[in-house]
Amino acid sequence: MAMQHMLGFTIHPATGGGNPYVVIGVGSNRTALAPTNAPDDSYWICIINAKNPRVMVKDWIIKGSDNSKVPPGIDTYMNDPEYIFVVATKTLSTLHVPQGAFFDFLTKYGAGPELQKLEQLNVVYGCGNYGNVSYALTGQCGPRGGGKPNPPSYEKGSIYGGYSALMMMSLMPGPNGAPPYSLCDTYTWTSP
């Protein structure tokens, strides 16, 4: 059986001017998804339709100073396997890496060593030595726990303020080449 056509899937947290964004596809066949006017020192969470990943279903902007709060109503989307989620930062201060309920929420949905690295940077050096960090997390939405394997999630962090934690992956259709799409932790898109 021939490999099914995959879509490029790129997550670009912002490290300066401009918004964080997600690009689905490549070249003239690409679609960019981004928040409207995300402030510096913030998190952007977006929910993408797994049946049509060029459609953003819902998004939230979380100010860095609200780094311990989980957005109300987000679990409705995060527990539904019809969606893919993306978390991307914009010029995040080391002072505002996730804490408390927000840290637990991100961990529940797949955050691990990359986020822990940013947490360690914060507690060891504080916000004076490293001003900003960059972080991206993505995964298939769906229930976690209950004795079943969790849907896959992927993350990337950068401790270098001027360099984004750029993630390049692919979206893979089902075996018949039709949606829903799932994440593929490799850059194996095929040109249309």
Model-derived regions, located:
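Short acidic-hydrophobic catalytic motif
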Residues: 1-192
